[in-house]
Amino acid sequence: GTPIQNHLHELWALLNFLYPEVFTSSDVFDVSFNPKAGAHIGSELVTQLHLLLQRCLLRRLKMDVEKGLPPKTETKIFLPLSPMQAEWYRRVLMRDVSALGTGRAGGGTGSTSIQNIVMHLRKVCNHPYLFEGAEPGPPFIEGEHLIQNSGKLAVLDKLLRRLKEGGHRVLIFCTMTRMVDILQDYFEYRRYEYCRLDGTTSTTEREEMMREFNRPGSDKFLFVLSTRAGGLGINLFTADTVVLYDSDWNP
């Protein structure tokens, strides 16, 4: 999917690597398949690409390879903001209200400014403690406030309690490393056994944690991963539940 999303010339490069005797000229391919500058890929062009790829690639579905695997069950949970989240949401919007109307804030371009606002709103929805000054303290003391001040974490707390009672084992993915820090505080507050993997985890530590999590009789209930660090070379086959706490908008 990535070459088609980025630039179709990348697709030609892959096909040329696989079949150099067939895909000899990139110019012919570019003229035949690349849309005009700024134009969207239309349905006719997509159909032509599908016909081409069907002759070059073998697509094998899960149902063709392993019929014994149960179907994936995907659940989307919608929930309200906590009072603290609602307040911080309002603060973000009021601080940048001019940008929402004009497309500019702080002298930046319109699209960049709006993206920055959206990123702050995403942080509010994940947990208000991602903002400096939101967490009560000092002293900073773990407690129920960590859970109650985030609607998303409050639901996760109830979900994990039921999953643990049912003997399940869980993977949790986050895009923000700071959010992983907050989840780690929550795991320790609830006394859940867990493993953590992010961009600072060495290859040796990564292998050791995977072995420990997958070990028969392991007491590790949770494995929390940052999305980018956890996308390569990970094999956690003993988990049966995946939670996307903060899904990546551009996977």
Residue ranges and their predicted role:
Residues G1-I41, H50-P251:
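ASCE P-loop NTPase motor core, strongest for the SF2 helicase catalytic module
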